[in-house]
């Protein structure tokens, strides 16, 4: 990127959560590259305050919602997983999705493997509470999947799947009866199919920010689990949730009571949250589309910040 800037090429940084820059050894280079962008489009308004705190210029920084709010689900998607949700509803129970990864675990690094069973204690207690006290079934799925490169292209489970598979195994080992109330999606899905699956749920609990977008963009009430600050610093969960009025549903990983109370609050207010999202999401999507015109004008040299 710096090479392009030195050659006089106009560069735009788009849909970004910059930083943190507090401990970056190459801070001088980062500052030089950042200052040379003609336009920086941040995904969360909170990022601008962070940039100012870190001493980075913000005159060329503007906010627009993440373009992932515009991603469309495969409305025709059907599978054994959607059938599970349909059966849950026939039994007059709600279907609650759960996904998280290494950034939400109490011990780092995020890619630690294997993991001790004790690291799942809080998540296990939350699952049991949902099943026993919230009249709900659980759909566990990975929102980060990989693929093999062409010519042998095929989807494969990402790193989160190992963590979630261990979570599922520990849960059903504790009580065989939980098998009828807990489903593990044990295959990687195309993004459009996964979004469709999420859209059929009644509620989502997520430690992955783009899973929250997949849910809220379809007006599915969502609980956000922050990244554990002992593993990595990030304000993304607060940033994404606050722009749609959902910041009260952000909770700290590892805090059993915070998780339980936040999940219960979301559950009790499902219909109210849906109405709130039905009002807010179209506005967010309109803003996400408008930024493309701003970028075009910047590239053509006529943007007025």
Tell what function each PLM region has.
Residues 1-305:
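Active-site anion-handling motifs in enzyme catalytic cores
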């Amino acid at each position: 990127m710096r090479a392009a800037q030195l050659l006089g090429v106009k560069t735009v940084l788009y849909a970004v959560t910059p930083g943190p820059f507090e401990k970056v050894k190459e801070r001088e280079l980062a500052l030089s590259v950042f200052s040379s962008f003609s336009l920086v489009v941040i995904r969360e308004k909170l990022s601008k305050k962070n940039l100012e705190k870190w001493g980075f210029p913000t005159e060329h920084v503007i906010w627009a919602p993440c373009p992932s709010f515009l991603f469309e689900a495969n409305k025709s998607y059907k599978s054994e997983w959607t059938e599970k949700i349909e059966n849950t509803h026939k039994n007059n129970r709600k279907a609650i999705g759960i996904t998280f990864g290494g950034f939400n675990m109490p011990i780092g690094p995020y890619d630690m493997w294997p993991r001790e069973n004790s690291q799942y204690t809080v998540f296990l207690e939350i699952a049991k509470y949902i099943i026993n006290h919230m009249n709900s079934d659980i759909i566990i799925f990975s929102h980060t999947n990989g693929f093999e490169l062409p010519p042998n292209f095929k989807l494969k489970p990402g790193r989160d799947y190992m963590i979630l598979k261990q979570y599922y195994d520990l849960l059903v080992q504790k009580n065989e009866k939980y098998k009828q109330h807990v489903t593990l999606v044990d295959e990687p899905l195309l993004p459009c199919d996964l979004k469709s699956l999420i859209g059929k749920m009644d509620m989502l609990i997520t430690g992955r920010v783009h899973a929250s977008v997949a849910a809220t963009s379809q007006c599915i009430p969502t609980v956000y689990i922050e990244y554990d600050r002992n593993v990595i610093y990030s304000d993304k969960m607060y940033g994404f949730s606050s722009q749609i009025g959902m910041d009260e549903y952000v909770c700290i990983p590892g805090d059993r009571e915070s998780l339980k109370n936040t999940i219960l609050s979301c559950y009790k207010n499902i219909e109210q949250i849906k109405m709130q999202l039905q009002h807010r999401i179209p506005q967010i999507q309109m803003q996400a589309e408008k930024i493309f015109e701003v970028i075009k004008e910047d590239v053509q040299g006529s943007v007025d910040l």
